[in-house]
Amino acid sequence: MRIIMKKTTLLVILDGWGYSDSDYFNAIKNANTPTWDSIWQEFPKTLINASSLEVGLPRSQMGNSEVGHVNIGCGRVVYQELTKIDKAIEEKTFGDNKAICAAIDNVIKNDSNLHLIGLLSPGGVHSHEEHIFEMIKIAKQKGIKRLYLHAFLDGRDTPPRSAEKSIKKADKLLQDLNLGYIASVCGRYYAMDRDNRWDRVEKAYNAIVNANADFIYDSALEALEQSYARDQSDEFVIPTCIKKDGHLVKVQDNDSVIFMNFRADRAREISHAFTDESFDHFPRKKHLNINFTTLTEYDSKLKCAVAFPPEQPINTLGEVLMKNHKTQLRIAETEKYPHVTFFFNGGREEQFEGEDRILIPSPKVATYDLQPEMSAPEVTDKLVAAINSGKYDCIVCNYANSDMVGHTGNYEAAMQAIEYLDKCIARLKDAILEHDGNMFITADHGNADMMVNPETQKPHTAHTTNLVPFIYVGHKKAQVALEHGKLSDIAPTLLNVMGIAQPKEMTGKTIFNFEK
């Protein structure tokens, strides 16, 4: 039986690869990238928007991987949880939310404690501290007597040592309301792992639940100062408990815990530790009988209340490909695997018919500047094999390097990561052109394009709001058809080159026109 070889359309998402003309600590521009340079000169290209209102975020808010992949995969501007929650606060309906009211009612009924856990940060990527402050005010208004904040510290979507301002704000608010205090602090490295480093999660869980930690101090500010003295920036603060009047706070039966992060991927692991009856990733003293509420849905398998449940979009790129009987592959290493699957499919866990997935484990290193190539070699090997197989109509892949190494603030390592990616792109280009396929290269947001803040001269570990590239590599003649494009225009462009009709739910526009 003759096997029909498919001409693959490949979407390569270079996570954290923004565009900037500045060469000031720009790891992308200053790296040695002969393949990228030649592609940029030879093939049709443009720059598109990956942040702010154009991706459903508040004005001037930097984009992120979750938001980026949702917008790309859905082919429309998807208004994000941050925007929805901000709107609820603005319209004064946040305190009327059924799940939040139930968590508070549980505390009042049992004369127990309310615990808020989450990333205390103005970063706006995984959480926003203003949501936490609003929750504290609502708790006071509704009659809560004892509220304890377990603060995860950022230093990744914010400057590495910037938590003091947020801690002072939280401390002052709690003190002014005579409501409680910050009961524990820890870096997001521990509480917000997403790579199955359960030893990290265990330390955070034990500090929050059992008041069991390597360090105990009299205030959150003292804990932060001592962490800095140990040369631990915000992200890496070792889980620490705070003692007030000789008292350490534990989470007990009948308490309520509200998780204030709105982004799912880094909130899942510790949520399972709180809620799973048969949890076995590390020992717990007991399975707590608590009301556990999450701001958004982190995982459909979690047994908890959700304040802002997801709205499932229809006719995403994956669904349209399935309806047209096309085969598709999603591939990434662990750090970005949820993004090319769950987020790309608009918050859908299940695979579509005809959708295969390949997960490449991320390297087990403390920080990725220690291994800037990460798992890109293995990802590329699998990608080239998939292209050569002729099995797939469409492949979506993510390279994590420019984002994950960019987050370390290590400029030299970021350049090494970019240079390695350039070699990977060369292999993909050769394979696609050999098989008469189509390749689009883009990014979900910027990061490695600014490794040092020019104003402060300090490491810049957060995302940027710079535009991102969108390049077509293939044998078709293509012309830019859309100025000022955005991430939601990518899916319509892929459908266009594949000859598939765009559904009405996709409001994006094609970026390139192709000669028939």
Curated annotation (Swiss-Prot):
Residues that, per the record, bind substrate: 126, 156-157, 188, 194, 263-266, 336
Task: Could you list this entry's UniProt keywords, alphabetically sorted.
Answer: Glycolysis, Isomerase, Manganese, Metal-binding
Its UniProt pathway annotation is: Carbohydrate degradation; glycolysis; pyruvate from D-glyceraldehyde 3-phosphate: step 3/5
Q: Which GO biological process entries does UniProt record here?
A: glucose catabolic process; glycolytic process
What Pfam families is this protein classified in? iPGM_N, Metalloenzyme
Superkingdom to which the source organism belongs: Bacteria
The family note in this entry says: Belongs to the BPG-independent phosphoglycerate mutase family.
* The protein's name: 2,3-bisphosphoglycerate-independent phosphoglycerate mutase
> What is the scientific name of the source organism?
Francisella tularensis subsp. holarctica (strain OSU18)
Q: Which gene encodes it?
A: gpmI
